[in-house]
């Protein structure tokens, strides 16, 4: 990782930062085949893929009972941490629950009604690292929304990570299945002999998971298509380079394809961050993953000519995680509307939101924060508009309705209004 100047970036260098994608094209055909086999063969396909991809011979696909046992068996301090994080996540998401309303609009009674989806499927990743926190982030908003049946799929293993299972139990999931990857998404979307089909499938995962979500979208709802983790730190000259570096390293350890970027208008800070990143990466448990992420074309320390240029770059980037470590952080925040989740000040590490502040860490990547937000109660709620008109209030707008209907050539629409006054 080295310092590059924004103004000096060539077209290809600049495009690397903004043309981030989930990398699904390379696996799309294989994923389509996996999804098709699960759809057609059910549990047989799930067991076959567990052998092929996870090197595991799966007995019971449904391991719901194992989640409760894991909760009892894990270390007390880990159990307490899970419960504390869950309480914070639940409290934050309870503030999001929408309320039905009806109002009078010149005699027309109009309103909105909110109802939860009937079922939801949550993917809790495994692979190179287990993510019990993702189980909390996916299940809790669904249960807060009132979803009756929430199922979790997590990759199979000789022993599925007990901390992940305990987190699934604490979150309140109704069913747990040991199935991973694209085949898990297909199972949650279409159902098998063991796995119940759900109305929506949510949760982060690798490019196979993301490609599968793209494949089933249309037959089932999804949250969004997420790619590798990313963070952008916008910092002024007063920022602590050690803290900036720590936040970059923390996201880099997720995935060798992660994107980690710092932007500053202070040349000294930029060089200090580069040095601090190199020092802090040394000796970390996932150092190889970290250094691979740091070497990506989508990672770097960028020097801006001014904070205004830094802000413009950050807004165009639309980071999954945006950390603002600057004296006027609130002012800068107002100028960067596009970000999945924002962390203000030196004592708001991105890791806090990843685990325990209560906000959700399932967030849009690849610039999609320009048009959508992260996982929330809204993800699991459907809204319906409601209207009741009296004879008088319908009469007030009858001419408007009939005139517009006839202008569109839909005379039956117009007649359906006139009939009420015959």
Curated annotation (Swiss-Prot):
NAD(+) binds at residues 123, 183, 206. Keywords: Amino-acid biosynthesis, Histidine biosynthesis, Metal-binding, NAD, Oxidoreductase, Zinc. It comes from the Archaea. Binds 1 zinc ion per subunit. Its EC number is 1.1.1.23. InterPro entries: Ald_DH/histidinol_DH, Histidinol_DH_CS, Histidinol_DH_monofunct, Hstdl_DH. The active site is at 320 (proton acceptor), 321 (proton acceptor). Pfam families: Histidinol_dh. Substrate binds at residues 229, 251, 254, 321, 354, 408, 413. One of its GO terms (cellular component) is cytoplasm. Gene3D superfamilies: 1.20.5.1300, Nitrogenase molybdenum iron protein domain (3.40.50.1980). NCBIfam families: hisD. Catalyzes the sequential NAD-dependent oxidations of L-histidinol to L-histidinaldehyde and then to L-histidine. This is Histidinol dehydrogenase. It comes from Haloarcula marismortui (strain ATCC 43049 / DSM 3752 / JCM 8966 / VKM B-1809).
């Amino acid at each position: 990782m080295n310092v590059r100047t924004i103004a000096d970036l060539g077209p290809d260098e600049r495009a690397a930062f903004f043309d981030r994608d989930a990398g699904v094209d390379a696996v799309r055909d294989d994923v389509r085949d996996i999804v098709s086999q699960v759809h057609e063969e059910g549990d047989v396909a799930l067991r076959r893929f567990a052998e092929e991809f996870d090197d595991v011979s799966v007995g019971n696909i449904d391991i719901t009972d194992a989640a409760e046992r894991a909760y009892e068996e894990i270390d007390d301090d880990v159990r307490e941490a899970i419960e504390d994080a869950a309480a914070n996540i639940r409290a934050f998401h309870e503030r999001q629950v929408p309320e039905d309303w009806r109002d009078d609009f010149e005699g027309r009674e109009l309103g909105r009604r909110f109802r939860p989806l009937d079922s939801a499927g949550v993917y809790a990743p495994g692979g190179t690292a287990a993510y019990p926190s993702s189980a909390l982030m996916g299940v809790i908003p669904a249960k807060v929304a009132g979803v009756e049946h929430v199922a979790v799929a997590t990759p199979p293993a000789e022993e599925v990570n007990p901390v992940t299972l305990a987190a699934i139990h604490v979150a309140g999931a109704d069913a747990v299945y040991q199935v991973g990857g694209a085949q898990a998404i297909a199972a949650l979307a279409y159902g098998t002999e063991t796995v119940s089909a759900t109305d929506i499938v949510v949760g982060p995962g690798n490019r196979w998971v993301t490609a599968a979500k793209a494949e089933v979208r249309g037959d089932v709802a999804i949250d969004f298509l997420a790619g590798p983790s990313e963070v952008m730190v916008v910092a002024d000259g007063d920022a602590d380079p050690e803290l900036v570096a720590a936040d970059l390293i923390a996201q880099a350890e997720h995935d060798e394809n992660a994107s980690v970027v710092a932007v500053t208008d202070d040349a000294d800070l930029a060089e200090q961050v580069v040095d601090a990143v190199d020092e802090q990466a040394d000796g970390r448990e996932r150092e190889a993953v970290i250094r691979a992420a740091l070497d990506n074309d989508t990672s770097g320390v960028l020097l801006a000519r001014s904070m205004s240029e830094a802000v413009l770059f950050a807004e165009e980037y639309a980071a999954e995680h945006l950390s603002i470590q600057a004296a006027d952080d609130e002012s800068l925040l107002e100028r960067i509307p596009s970000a999945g989740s924002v962390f203000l000040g030196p004592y708001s590490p991105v890791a806090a939101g990843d685990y325990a502040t209560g906000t959700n860490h399932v967030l849009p990547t690849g610039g999609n924060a320009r048009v959508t937000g992260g996982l929330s109660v809204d993800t699991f709620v459907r809204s319906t508009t409601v209207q009741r008109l009296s004879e008088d209030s319908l009469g007030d707008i009858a001419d408007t309705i009939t005139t517009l209907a006839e202008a569109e050539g839909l005379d039956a629409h117009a007649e359906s209004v006139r009939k009420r006054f015959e």
